[in-house]
């Protein structure tokens, strides 16, 4: 058994139900688990850290990323594009990725997250070029090398340009191929035990790049295996128009009809929900990953986070992909989220502490 003692912490921000902020306190851990907090705890442990000059808070949890995009960040030709044009341009680069690109991009992106206080990374990987190998296995190996908790997704796309989607043919798969590999990934890598460092979610890319059948089967399979569901939703007005044109309903109604609401589901972005839809998210416990920097860069809009929090919608914080953020610092995201909503909502905006709680406990939920 390994033990850790944080001795005489100046300030401990717990983010617990009572919002306790403690001073001059010790924290004692065994095998990575906090066992007790208080004054004058055991004086010895395998590792003792003098916390006299430190503030301590829970590790940040990143709820949406595209680590593979780390190798395509800061490209001048896409800096002023909005989402659909941005995607179609970058797919021509992303269709060439392989296992080594994934390894290096994952190490770089997760390393940057760790550097800025993030201890858990969820990644939404949905680009699987033919012959690229076991890309999620590569990601889990990179996470283990760094020591970060990894929540990876078996993403997917089955609609290419010929089907009215955005990606090229070479990066989409059939529903049957996706389902078979989803089972493989879950059985090979998902660890549901408490404290697990490795979990899997199913995450079709978006309602404009996958078929209703893929969404339906993914929801059924996820619940058979007890894994969570994730996708992009209500990120742009273009998406809203696409859904109304092709399916005759707004995005959330479409997803709900396919089984995509509930406490095991969370959506990235969630910018363009109306009042009724926000209430439905709260009623069903469906979560939202808030990505303020990406939303600003791609001119997608501002998520209605103050209203979500007031209604009880589960909200976490996320950096989104490095190609739409040009970085992987969740601490920067936290500061920008605070400032953005101060500008947009004034006194109704979440406080700095509420944003920290969103990036820790809210994201973990």
Regions found by a protein language model. Give the residues of each.
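N-terminal metal-binding scaffold of metallo-dependent hydrolase/deaminase domains
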Residues: 1-43, 54-55
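C-terminal helical cap
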Residues: 8-12, 106-113, 287, 295-297, ...
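Alpha-helical scaffold segments that flank or form the walls of functional sites
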Residues: 73-124, 129-149, 179-195
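Metal-coordinating catalytic core of metallo-dependent amide/deamination hydrolases
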Residues: 131-270
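Glycine-enriched alpha-helix->loop->beta-strand junction motifs that scaffold or abut catalytic
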Residues: 147, 222-228, 260-263, 280-289, ...
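His/Asp/Glu-enriched, well-ordered alpha-helical/loop segment
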Residues: 257-264, 306-365
